UniProtKB/Swiss-Prot annotation:
Compositionally skewed regions (Basic residues) per UniProt: 483-498
Membrane topology classification: Multi-pass membrane protein
Organism encoding this protein: Debaryomyces hansenii (strain ATCC 36239 / CBS 767 / BCRC 21394 / JCM 1990 / NBRC 0083 / IGC 2968) (Yeast)
Name of protein: Pheromone-regulated membrane protein 10
Transmembrane stretches, start-end: 683-703, 707-727, 736-756, 762-782, 800-820, 838-858, 866-886, 892-912, 917-937, 978-998
Compositional bias annotation for Acidic residues: 116-132, 143-161
Length: 1008
């Protein structure tokens, strides 16, 4: 006997459905056994027989109310059913609920919105019996998809009316269809209604799918209707309930179907898709879990797991199981709140209830087991990166990218999510109690020794002062109590038994307070397990019992664990040592100091070391952290900063190899050690000769020296080179006053030679300035300007100020040297302009390549590095020379230096960008050329000669004007150095902006 459900008009029912809507949908369990027995007599049609051939494709009735109406629909659990049919129904229902996360609602298969609106209109009209058509391959005996598409021509509305009229005659328990035509005419205009409202009407008015199929096929067989009429009546029914994602044609096959506007269902418009969308979940739960093909559509109800023998046939892609587990948990809690309330406390996405063998929880479990087995040994030596959860500077690490000039090489290597565990935490793992088998996470929660934290021990002492008292009366009572037993142990015949009993008494020892009441044992931590234990002797394998064999196996596992931890500690120490050696090498060989912190950070990221770096001039503070124990190890890397272009190139090559995982750390450490121990390319005596050659080459083009001044400058330059390479290197005390003493010696000799024949043959200013050109602070100015550009204010300000003070030292030495010779010779010359300078400018530029080559060789550059250095230096000098020829620019030192530095920066950036070389090494000689040229334009290096003349003159009377001029003359050289520094800095900034307008530099100017 069929069950009927009364309903009102469509308009009124839709309003009631909206009012009675509940946000949490409960899907009750269904008892279909009795209902099937009642309908067994009427299910003899061909369509029912075809339905029986399907395996486990039993339909499920969805009630039109959340509360049970009769005994057929019950909220009781399906496990209480006794019949075999009910058990099959139970498996199917629970299987559907458990497999909800495995359905795919692919976003790229969703059709146009007008189709979805038409589906909603059909749902709202209440035509649950005849507005759906089954897919063509749902029943194998019904024909192919091409036949169905060919038979779909005709008036679909009239077919639907005939089907409804026949259902009214046969099924008396169904609802009255008097308003069928009016509701059907309204169905196409209801597309703009709320989808949730249409879903409620669909859920409240659904009947058993199998019942509809049986009664509809019986009417069609009696009236001998065509196959097209039958397929048209059921296609829309089951495509709303089909659990299989079918591929429908994207457009109607003919013009008649286009006129009818037959909607093609999207995967999100199926019944289960609408139910899932009501729970706040968008789309499907497992996108891309199944594959589709137009040639052959698979019945996924059979493949997903409704048959025991075919439970693993679904083809899955790589999924995010944690996210799917959370979605499945939300669905269960939304649709089955009773079951969700029975979940144990602390259930997470990793611990799902085992609903069926094909549920997503099994997939998560299997994936986690395989992943844990593969990475179990590696995970114990890793800790989370403190940059994510302690320091919180991951989002702020690229703030420097706001400045266009900065190198964005930091973005190439992201900070790792996990870093290598520190040395201290690894040592704690090595010496902790192996029997407890606690993981490394126990270091943050519970103490390894004793099982209690220090806070628990301190709380115990405060809560129970009697137990923490220093006067332990319980020991005295126990001595009296156990005294006879201990005396009995001394009997010769009871030695073994007494020892055993004594150990049992000690293990079962009780503690009492002063009143004699028994109290708990004092909760004191034990450190006896922290000592390393000697391995026990292992007997032969054939004579070992099973229990002893297990102990030996456990002992071997512990030994393997200790070996792994020991190797890990050695590896961590090796990596940390490599980082400090790399830092020392970069500082010693003259790497750009403004990049040291970033390069050290990149190296630590690649090596998975938690390292923090802070640079100060002459010192690098290195901190290696241990996130497990919240400790850090701080090192100070201090070294005398020098300049060695060849070794700097080798260090850069080693650094690049480690960064790009081309060179292992062991081999890189060995190469660094060899590089640090390696001798310089050129001997000190050769460098002294190059000093003299460079001094002679700079004299003509920078300080307007004559041909006679070249050999004199060569000899004086040899003296300066000898003082620097031999005297200063052997005496730390003299190295502090090297600049002053060198300037004194050079000025004294130059004034003595220039005074011959009143300066007719030799130029005093050219000889003095040319000999001091190689010790001018050109490199200090370059590094200081780069640090200021990179917003490293501390180091940049210190270097720039040091360059100014260094220049004042030189000026003071020049004044003192000139005064010393003035006291010796009263006829000493004081002119600062040369009479016999080279007039042809074409000859002056020939000395620039030679001076650049001497600078490169003095700084230990390779011969193959000299060509690019010479080209850049010559181009920069040409710009400075012609800028100085202009009348308006001749007196503006900072502008001429800016033009020269701009040209040098452009060529250096282009060389770095095209040739992938070191821009700083190529630019360094060119910057050295710019500094003497800028100083010579003002002739401020000899500004102290006027003060020297006043010191040696007989007139001791001075005025305020002369005092002011003296003070201005003494500071003139420092002011000139400031102007040159500003011009060089601005020129380098502008050149970087010109070559890298978007700020992206892989091996640009400010990288190595």
């Amino acid at each position: 006997m069929s069950q009927s459900f009364p309903r009102n008009d469509t308009s009124s029912s839709s309003e009631d459905e909206t009012d009675n809507y509940r946000s949490h949908i409960q899907i009750p369990s269904l008892d279909l056994a009795n209902y099937r027995k009642q309908q067994k007599s009427t299910s003899k049609t061909n369509l029912a027989k075809a339905g029986k051939k399907l395996k486990n494709n039993k339909s499920v009735r969805f009630p039109d109310s959340y509360s049970p109406r009769d005994t057929i629909i019950s909220n009781a659990s399906t496990t209480n059913n006794s019949s075999s049919d009910s058990e099959l129904e139970q498996d199917m229902v629970t299987g559907e609920n458990s497999n909800l996360p495995n359905f795919n609602f692919s976003a790229n298969q969703v059709h146009s919105p007008e189709y979805a609106n038409e589906d909603d209109a059909n749902d709202d009209s209440g035509e649950e019996e005849d507005t759906f058509e089954p897919p063509a391959d749902f029943y194998a005996s019904e024909g192919s998809d091409e036949d169905m598409e060919a038979d779909n021509e005709g008036d679909n509305v009239e077919d639907k009316e005939e089907v409804v009229n026949e259902k009214e005659e046969i099924a008396d328990d169904l609802h009255s269809k008097s308003s069928k035509t009016s509701r059907e005419s309204k169905s196409f205009n209801a597309g703009t209604k709320n989808s949730r409202r249409s879903l409620n009407s669909l859920q409240r008015n659904e009947t058993d799918v199998t019942d509809q199929l049986k009664r509809t096929t019986s009417t069609t067989s009696s009236s001998k209707r065509s196959n097209s009429d039958k397929r048209t009546g059921f296609k829309d029914i089951l495509r709303k309930f089909a659990l299989v994602d079918q591929q429908y044609p994207e457009a109607p096959s003919n013009r008649e179907s286009e006129d009818l506007g037959e909607p093609q269902p999207s995967r999100s418009d199926t019944f289960l898709g609408n139910v899932l969308s009501m729970a706040g979940e968008s789309g499907g739960l497992v996108p891309g879990a199944t594959h589709f093909s137009r040639e052959k559509t698979i019945d996924e109800e059979e493949e997903v797991g409704f048959e025991d023998e075919d439970s693993d046939l679904i083809e899955m892609k790589k999924l995010d199981f944690a996210q799917l587990s959370n979605e499945a948990q939300n669905l269960i809690s939304t649709h089955v709140p009773d079951l969700a309330n029975k979940l144990p406390e602390g259930t997470s996405s990793d611990q799902q209830l085992d609903y069926s063998d094909t549920s997503a929880s099994n997939l998560i479990k299997n994936d986690e087991e395989t992943g844990n087995e593969a990475t179990k040994k590696d995970d114990e030596f890793y800790t989370p990166n403190p940059d994510y959860f302690i320091r919180g500077d991951i989002n702020n690490e690229n703030d420097a990218d706001d400045y266009l000039m900065l190198d964005e090489h930091m973005d190439d290597i992201a900070p790792p999510k996990r870093v290598q565990a520190g040395v201290l935490s690894s040592l704690l793992k090595l010496y902790q109690n192996p029997q407890e088998q606690q993981s490394s996470s126990s270091l943050t929660s519970k103490s390894t020794y004793g099982g209690n934290t220090l806070a628990d021990d301190s709380n115990y002492s405060y809560s129970d002062p009697k137990a923490a008292s220093t006067l332990d009366f319980t020991k005295l009572k126990n001595d009296f109590k156990n005294g006879p037993k201990r005396m009995a142990n001394k009997i010769p015949g009871r030695k073994h038994g007494a020892q055993k009993q004594d150990t049992q008494d000690e293990s079962a020892q009780k503690y009492y307070d002063e009143d004699g009441n028994e109290i708990a044992a004092p909760n004191l931590p034990s450190f006896h397990n922290a000592k390393p234990k000697a391995p026990k002797k292992i007997a032969a394998a054939g004579k070992v019992p099973s229990k002893v064999h297990k102990k030996l196996k456990e002992h071997k596992r512990q030994q393997d664990q200790q070996l792994r931890i020991t190797v890990h500690i050695a590896d961590i120490l090796h990596r940390q040592r490599f980082i400090m050696r790399m830092c020392k090498a970069l500082m010693m060989f003259g790497a750009p100091t403004h990049r040291l912190e970033e390069y050290m950070t990149l190296t630590s990221r690649v090596l998975e070391i938690d390292g923090q770096f802070v640079y100060f001039p002459g010192c690098m503070i290195v901190s290696f952290g241990d996130a497990s124990t919240r400790t850090s190890e701080v090192h100070l890397v201090r070294c005398a900063q020098g300049l060695n272009l060849s070794k700097l190139s080798d260090t850069h090559r080693i650094y690049k190899g480690v960064i790009h995982d081309i060179l292992p750390v062991d081999e890189a450490s060995t190469q660094l050690e060899e590089l640090l121990k390696k001798k310089n390319r050129y001997s000190p005596w050769l460098c002294v000769f190059l000093y003299g050659l460079g001094s002679s080459m700079v004299c003509p083009f920078a300080f307007n020296g004559g041909w006679y001044d070249v050999p004199i400058a060569f000899g004086v330059g040899l003296c300066v080179g000898y003082l620097q390479f031999f005297v200063s290197s052997k005496s730390n005390l003299y190295s502090s006053v090297f600049e002053v003493t060198a300037s004194i010696v050079v000025t004294f000799i130059a004034r003595a030679i220039g005074s011959i024949h009143d300066g007719e043959y030799f130029c005093f200013s050219a000889i003095a300035q040319g000999s001091l050109a190689l010790i001018l602070p050109g490199y200090i100015i370059l590094t200081g300007s780069l640090e200021l550009q990179s917003r490293n204010i501390v180091a940049g300000s210190v270097r720039m100020f040091y360059a100014i003070i260094y220049s004042l030292f030189l000026g003071f030495g020049i004044t003192l040297g000139a005064s010393l010779y003035g006291w010796v010779d009263s006829n000493a010359i004081s002119t600062t302009k040369c009479k016999n300078s080279i007039k042809q400018d074409e000859f002056k530029i020939l000395f620039v390549p030679l001076f650049s080559a001497c600078l490169g060789l003095i700084n230990q550059a390779r011969w193959r590095q000299l060509p690019i250095m010479i080209v850049i230096a010559c181009a920069g000098y040409v710009g400075t020379f012609f800028a100085g020829k202009h009348k308006q620019f001749s007196e503006v030192t900072e502008f001429t230096a800016c033009i020269g530095a701009f040209i040098v920066g452009i060529l250096g950036n282009l060389y770095s960008r095209i040739g992938k070389g070191m821009a700083v090494a190529a630019m360094l000689p060119a910057i050295f050329v710019q500094v003497p040229s800028g100083i010579a334009s003002q002739s401020t290096l000899l500004a102290g000669v006027e003060s020297a003349d006043k010191l040696t003159s007989s007139n001791s009377t001075t005025t305020d004007t002369s005092t002011a001029s003296d003070s201005a003359g003494s500071l003139a050289f420092g002011a000139t150095m400031v102007k040159v520094s500003i011009g060089i800095s601005v020129g380098l900034f502008a050149s970087a902006l010109f070559v890298y307008p978007f700020g992206k530099k892989k091996t640009g100017l400010f990288s190595l």
